[in-house]
C-alpha cells in the first residue's frame, strides 16, 4: 500500500501548537512521509472526508475556547446534521496543548477527539494532553506520544522498499533559501506590512497598526519591588474598536544590544540585504518580513533569540555543528537520555537561544543562514487585557504592564521580552510606534443595565475591570463591585484616586485587600468571606455576574473555595449543592475567569 499524504492541522493562539505541528512535519519528512501542515481555518474542511491520515494539534484558550484560527472549523465539525459515517475512512490522532492551572485543561482536544470518533474516525492513539505547567513543558507528554504515533503510522503505512529513514544527524533541507543581494534595490524601502489609517480592513497579525505611544508611566512606588507601567496608545484612524474584556496583541522586538551580539556570534552582517525564497511550492514567505529584508530586520523583529530553546533546537543545531566536542554535547541534549541534563542547563535557569549560541561559538559561527528560520522560532505577539474604555478615552487604548524580571542562577537577570521592551520605550524622547491589533477576550459583560457585576482583580488582574467599570459607568450602570488586592496602599494601589471618585458618585463599591499592611496577610478571598452576605444577595437574588482575573497559581482555587463557603454559610447549601451551584454559574457564564500562569 503506498504511503498516504499525512495532513497536520493546527489550532494555535500563541504559536506553540504551530511549533509542534511544524515539528510533526519535519519528523514525517524524515520518515519519508509526504506531509502538509496547515492552520485549521485555512484548510477547506469539506475535503476532510477524503483524508486518510490526519493529526490535529489544538491549543485551548480562555474558558475552554478554541483558538481564533480554528473557530470556523469548530463550528462546522459540531454541526448536528453531519452523518456518523462522515469520517469512516480517516485514521486520526489528537494532540492537545493546555495549562493544568485552568479548570478546562485541554478541553478543546478532548472534545474534538470525542467528536471525530462520533463521526466514524479511527483513533490511532488516545488524545495527548500537553501541559505548560509541567517542569519540562508540553514536551513531557508530547515526546513519548510522538514515538507511539510514528510506530502506529509506520505500522499501517510502511515506506516504499529501499527508502530508509533520514538519520537524525543529517539535516533536512532548509525551508527557505536566503538570496543575498550585492547592492540595495533601487525601489522600495524596508519595513513591515502595516495597516494604515483609514484602511478598510481592521489591523491584524499580518497587518498590525503602528500605534503612537502617548505615555509610558510607572504606577508603582519607587521602592516597590515590581515596575508596573500604565501605557497609552493613540489609535485614531486605525479602524480598531473594542469592548470591555477584549485584549490587545503587541508585537515586540529584540533589544539592539542582543541583535548586535547575535550577529557577532554568527558572523552576520546586520546590513546585508536578502530575498527570502521558499524551497517548496506550497510554502509561502512570512507576511511579516519585507522583501527585500535586512539581516538586522530579521533578527530584530522576527527571530525569537530571547526565548528558551526547545529540544528540537538542539536536534537541528547538532545536525549543523562541525565542531566535534560541541556536536557531542548538543547530541546529548537532544537525546531522550539527556533531557534531565538539558532541563538543568536550559529550562531551569531560563537560558535563552542567544546565550546557548554564545556557549557553542564554533557551531554558531558555522550555521548556514538558510537555516535561521528553521532553527529559531518566530517572535510571538503578547496579549494584554485592555484597561480602558473608548466611551471614557475616545481614540485611546491603555494597558497595565508588569515588567517581568527575575533572577536564576545565571548572572544576568531574566527579563520578559515584551514587557521589558515596552518599558524601555520613551515617547518623551521622540516618536514611538508599537505594532498592535485587537481581538475579543474571554470575558463578556452583561448588556442589561440593572445586572450587578462582582469583579475580583488582584494586582494587574484589575486591568480588564477598569475597562468594564468605565464602560458601565458611561452607560449609567452603577451596580459595580470591585474586590482589588495589592500589597501596600501607597505602593501598588492602581488607580486609587479614580476608584475613590467613582465611589463618591455611587458608581462603584470598592473592597480593597492590602496583604502586607498588617501581621496577618489579607487577600481578596478573605474580603469575599467577610462580605459573604452581600455576595450571596447579589448572586442569588439579584442575578449578579462574577468575574475573576489574575495569576493562575493559587488565587482562582482560593476564590472558588471562598465562594463555596459563602454558598454554604449564607445560602444554607450542603457541599454537593454548593458545588452544583458554582457549576451552574460557570455553565451560564455568570462566573467567568481570565487567569494566566
From Swiss-Prot:
* Region feature (Disordered): 188-207
Which residue spans adopt a coiled-coil conformation according to this UniProt entry? none
* pH-activity profile: Optimum pH is about 8.0.
- The UniProt record gives the binding positions of NADP(+) as 460, 515-516, 521-525, 558
Give a GO molecular function annotation for the protein: oxidoreductase activity, acting on NAD(P)H, heme protein as acceptor
Q: Which domain of life is it from?
A: Eukaryota
GO terms in the biological process aspect are: electron transport chain; iron-sulfur cluster assembly
Q: What is its main location?
A: cytoplasm
Its localization reads: Cytoplasm, Perinuclear region
List residues binding FMN: 12-17, 59-62, 97-106, 132
Q: Where does FAD bind?
A: 350, 382-385, 416-419, 596
Q: Look up the record and name the cofactor or cofactors this protein needs.
A: FAD; FMN
Q: What is its EC number?
A: 1.18.1.-
Return the PROSITE patterns for the record.
FAD_FR, FLAVODOXIN_LIKE
Tissue distribution is: Low expression in brain, heart, kidney, pancreas, prostate and skeletal muscle. Highest levels in the placenta.
Variant or mutagenesis effect after changing residue 522 to I? In allele NDOR1*1; shows a decrease in affinity for NADPH and a reduction in ferricyanide reductase activity
Swiss-Prot/TrEMBL catalytic activity: 2 oxidized [2Fe-2S]-[protein] + NADPH = 2 reduced [2Fe-2S]-[protein] + NADP(+) + H(+)
Q: What quaternary arrangement does the UniProt entry report?
A: Interacts with CIAPIN1; as part of the cytosolic iron-sulfur (Fe-S) protein assembly (CIA) machinery. Interacts with DCPS.
Similarity remark: Belongs to the NADPH-dependent diflavin oxidoreductase NDOR1 family.
Instruction: State the function annotated in the UniProt record.
Output: NADPH-dependent reductase which is a central component of the cytosolic iron-sulfur (Fe-S) protein assembly (CIA) machinery. Transfers electrons from NADPH via its FAD and FMN prosthetic groups to the [2Fe-2S] cluster of CIAPIN1, another key component of the CIA machinery. In turn, this reduced cluster provides electrons for assembly of cytosolic iron-sulfur cluster proteins. It can also reduce the [2Fe-2S] cluster of CISD1 and activate this protein implicated in Fe/S cluster repair. In vitro can fully activate methionine synthase/MTR in the presence of soluble cytochrome b5/CYB5A.
* Protein name (Swiss-Prot/TrEMBL): NADPH-dependent diflavin oxidoreductase 1
Recorded source organism is Homo sapiens (Human)
Q: Which gene encodes it?
A: NDOR1
Amino acid at each position: 500500500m503506498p504511503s498516504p499524504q499525512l495532513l497536520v492541522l493546527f489550532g494555535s493562539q500563541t504559536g506553540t501548537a504551530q511549533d509542534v505541528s511544524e515539528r510533526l512535519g519535519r519528523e514525517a519528512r524524515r520518515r519519508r512521509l509526504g506531509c502538509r501542515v496547515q492552520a485549521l481555518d485555512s484548510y477547506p474542511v469539506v475535503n476532510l472526508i477524503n483524508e486518510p491520515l490526519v493529526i490535529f494539534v489544538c491549543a485551548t484558550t480562555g474558558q475552554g475556547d478554541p483558538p481564533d484560527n480554528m473557530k470556523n472549523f469548530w463550528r462546522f465539525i459540531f454541526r448536528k446534521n453531519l452523518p456518523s459515517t462522515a469520517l469512516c475512512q480517516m485514521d486520526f490522532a489528537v494532540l492537545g496543548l493546555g495549562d493544568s492551572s485552568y479548570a478546562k485543561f485541554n478541553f478543546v482536544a478532548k472534545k474534538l477527539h470525542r467528536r471525530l470518533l462520533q463521526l466514524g474516525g479511527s483513533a490511532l492513539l488516545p488524545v495527548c494532553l500537553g501541559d505548560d505547567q509541567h517542569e519540562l513543558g508540553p514536551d513531557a507528554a508530547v515526546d513519548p506520544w510522538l514515538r507511539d504515533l510514528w510506530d502506529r503510522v509506520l505500522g499501517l503505512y510502511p515506506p516504499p522498499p529501499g527508502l530508509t529513514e533520514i538519520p537524525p544527524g543529517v539535516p533536512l533541507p532548509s525551508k527557505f533559501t536566503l538570496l543575498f543581494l550585492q547592492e540595495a534595490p533601487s525601489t522600495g524601502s524596508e519595513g513591515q506590512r502595516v495597516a494604515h489609517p483609514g484602511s478598510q480592513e481592521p489591523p491584524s497579525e499580518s497587518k498590525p497598526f503602528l500605534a503612537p505611544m502617548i505615555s509610558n508611566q510607572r504606577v508603582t512606588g519607587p521602592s516597590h519591588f515590581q515596575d508596573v507601567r500604565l501605557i497609552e496608545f493613540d489609535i485614531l484612524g486605525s479602524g480598531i474598536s473594542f469592548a470591555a474584556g477584549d485584549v490587545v496583541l503587541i508585537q515586540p522586538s529584540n533589544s539592539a544590544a542582543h541583535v548586535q551580539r547575535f550577529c557577532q556570534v554568527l558572523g552576520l552582517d546586520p546590513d546585508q540585504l536578502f530575498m527570502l525564497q521558499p524551497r517548496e511550492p506550497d510554502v509561502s514567505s512570512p507576511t511579516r518580513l519585507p522583501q527585500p529584508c535586512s539581516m538586522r530586520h530579521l533578527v530584530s523583529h522576527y527571530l525569537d533569540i530571547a526565548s528558551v530553546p526547545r529540544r528540537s533546537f538542539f536536534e537541528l543545531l547538532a545536525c549543523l555543528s562541525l565542531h566535534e566536542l560541541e556536536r557531542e554535547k548538543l547530541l546529548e541534549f537532544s537525546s531522550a537520555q539527556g533531557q534531565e541534563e538539558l532541563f538543568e542547563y536550559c529550562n531551569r535557569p531560563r537560558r535563552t537561544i542567544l546565550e546557548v549560541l554564545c556557549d557553542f561559538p564554533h557551531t554558531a559561527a558555522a550555521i548556514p543562514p538558510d537555516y535561521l528560520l528553521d532553527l529559531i522560532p518566530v517572535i510571538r505577539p503578547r496579549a494584554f487585557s485592555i484597561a480602558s474604555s473608548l466611551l471614557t478615552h475616545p481614540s485611546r487604548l491603555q494597558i497595565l504592564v508588569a515588567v517581568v524580571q527575575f533572577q536564576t542562577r545565571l548572572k544576568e537577570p531574566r527579563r520578559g521580552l515584551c514587557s521589558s521592551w515596552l518599558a524601555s520605550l520613551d515617547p518623551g524622547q521622540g516618536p514611538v510606534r508599537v505594532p498592535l491589533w485587537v481581538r475579543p477576550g474571554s470575558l463578556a459583560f452583561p448588556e442589561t443595565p440593572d445586572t450587578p457585576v462582582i469583579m475580583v482583580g488582584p494586582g494587574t488582574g484589575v486591568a480588564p475591570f477598569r475597562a468594564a467599570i468605565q464602560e458601565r459607568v458611561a452607560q449609567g450602570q452603577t451596580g459595580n463591585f470591585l474586590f482589588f488586592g495589592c500589597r501596600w496602599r501607597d505602593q501598588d494601589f492602581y488607580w486609587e484616586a479614580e476608584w475613590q471618585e467613582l465611589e463618591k458618585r455611587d458608581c462603584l463599591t470598592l473592597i480593597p485587600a492590602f496583604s502586607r499592611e498588617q501581621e496577618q496577610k489579607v487577600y481578596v478571598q478573605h474580603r469575599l468571606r467577610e462580605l459573604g452576605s452581600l455576595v450571596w444577595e447579589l448572586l442569588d437574588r439579584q442575578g449578579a455576574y462574577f468575574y475573576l482575573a489574575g495569576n493562575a497559581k493559587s488565587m482562582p482555587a482560593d476564590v472558588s473555595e471562598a465562594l463555596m463557603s459563602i454558598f454554604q454559610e449564607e445560602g444554607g447549601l450542603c457541599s454537593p449543592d454548593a458545588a452544583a451551584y458554582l457549576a451552574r454559574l460557570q455553565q451560564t457564564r455568570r462566573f467567568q475567569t481570565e487567569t494566566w500562569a
